[in-house]
UniProtKB/Swiss-Prot annotation:
One example of a Gene Ontology biological process annotation: protoporphyrinogen IX biosynthetic process from glutamate
Any one GO molecular function term: NADP binding
Keywords, comma-separated and alphabetical: NADP, Oxidoreductase, Porphyrin biosynthesis
Keyword NADP: yes
Record protein name field: Glutamyl-tRNA reductase
Binding site for substrate: T55, C56, N57, R58, S114, E119, T120, Q121, Q125
Length: 432
């Protein structure tokens, strides 16, 4: 079995492409089924394995397969599933085989490949991806072991290095940007759209600035109300957004919607109602919640996850010593995992040897039972049984020795000596 990771992320593709390749949560299980069966060889000797990790910053397919053409098949499947031409998608896709796939998984879970260096959210997202793949019946020995090692490495990296210390989060970056637009956040009305983890983090950072008003709009009113109460704010129905958008100076959105929930026309009307006072908007969703054209309006300052990334990277440079330490840990653990993977490669051979040997044994035992049933001498039957087993078991090694020459034969001879040097001696030879 070969490990392979196919994906795009914030390093290789802009948000405009990432949002088109993202998988809504409810689509991941059925997508895994088609991905496994169509492109990872359903009739291969070993059952293929797969997991899909889809976040704001990355979409990745983790595979274990015997299919040597899995790379091309996975890219083609991703293209067809999302209806994106291969020529448009392929230049942004990375394909990581074997140890590169292992190293990548370890780095992602440890926060080394994140826009926010050392952030912990990705670890939870990866665990969610594994849980979903397990529920879909898409995981097996190889990916299960990979992800368990991945989580252990992430824990080791975070526990022994300062990789997560003093990190500038996306939420903190949003506050910094707002402070560039407005003299003080405390005079502004802030609206958060959504009630997930990212909105909760953003609300925490903005609430620390004591805004004039803090409002949560969410599809599920009860969840929005609970979050609003935590920050002494209030909730409003998401359906009120078009008519009340003009009330807010700062709007932060991060929902799981597959289509934009804020369009150009709605924002144009809000700007007009505000008499062209500026609106600061942050779209942390992938796919995006706010139509990109909104950013072209004169009095609107619209930022996406990629825009916030520049601010985040300013805080990453100071922690390069921790990065080097983390990379050393990861490299050691990659080698350990590859050693385990190497041992797995002989398992099918050993299993086949056991099957063949057992078939020989059963055939000879059946012959012996027939001879005993017709009254043959038991001692003679046992002698014939042992001779037949001996001849058949050494037939393979003997044939191999006769087929090779030169250095190959010498190596095989040494190997055979090792096999048989500890063979038990008969009682008369041992003197007992």
């Amino acid at each position: 079995m070969q490990l392979l990771t196919i994906g795009i992320n914030h390093h290789t593709a802009p948000v405009a492409l990432r949002e088109r390749v993202a998988f809504p949560l409810e689509q991941i299980k059925p997508a895994l089924v088609t991905f496994k069966n169509v492109f990872l060889g359903p009739h291969a000797p070993n059952a293929p394995e797969a997991a899909i990790l889809s976040t704001c910053n990355r979409t990745e397919l983790y595979c274990a397969t015997d299919d040597r053409a899995a790379r091309e098949g996975a890219i083609r499947w991703l293209s067809e599933y999302h209806r994106i031409p291969v020529d448009e998608l392929a230049p942004h896709v990375y394909a990581l085989p074997q140890s590169e796939a292992v190293r990548h998984a370890f780095r992602v879970a440890s926060g080394l490949d994140s826009m926010v260096l050392g952030e912990t959210q990705i670890l939870g997202q990866m665990k969610d991806a594994v849980r979903t793949a397990t529920e879909a019946g898409a995981l097996g020995t190889y990916l299960n072991q990979l992800f368990q090692r991945t989580f252990a490495v992430a824990k080791e990296v975070r526990g022994t290095t300062e990789i997560g210390a003093q990190s500038v989060s996306m939420a903190a970056a949003a506050v910094r940007l707002a402070q560039r637009i407005f003299e003080t956040v405390s005079d502004q009305r802030v609206l958060f759209i959504g009630a997930g983890e990212m909105i909760e983090l953003c609300a925490t950072h903005f609430a620390a600035q004591s805004p004039r008003e803090l409002v949560i709009a969410n599809r599920t009113a009860e969840r929005g109300q609970r979050l609003a109460e935590r920050f002494n704010g209030r909730a409003m129905p998401l359906s009120d957004l078009p008519t009340r958008m003009h009330e807010f100076d700062i709007i932060v959105s991060c929902t799981a919607s597959t289509l934009p929930i804020i369009g150009l026309g709605a924002v144009e009307r809000a700007v007009k109602a505000r008499r062209h006072r500026p609106i600061f908007m942050v779209d942390l969703a992938v796919p995006r919640d706010i139509e990109p054209e909104v950013g072209k309006l004169k009095d609107v300052f619209l930022y996406t996850v990629d825009d916030l990334g520049a601010i985040v990277r300013e805080g990453n440079a100071s922690r390069q010593a921790a990065v080097a330490q983390a990379e050393t840990i990861i490299e050691t653990r990659v080698q350990n995992f590859m050693q385990w993977l190497d041992t797995r490669s002989v398992v099918p051979v050993i299993r086949h040897m056991h099957t063949q040997a057992d078939a020989l044994r059963r055939a000879e035992v059946e012959k012996a039972q027939k001879l005993l049933a017709r009254g043959d001498d038991p001692a003679a039957v046992l002698e014939a049984l042992s001779q037949a087993l001996t001849n058949k078991l050494i037939h393979g090694p003997t044939s191999a020795l006769n087929r090779v020459n030169g250095a190959d034969r010498d190596s095989l001879i040494d190997l055979m000596r090792g096999f048989y040097q500890h063979a038990p001696r008969s009682n008369d030879q041992s003197g007992h």
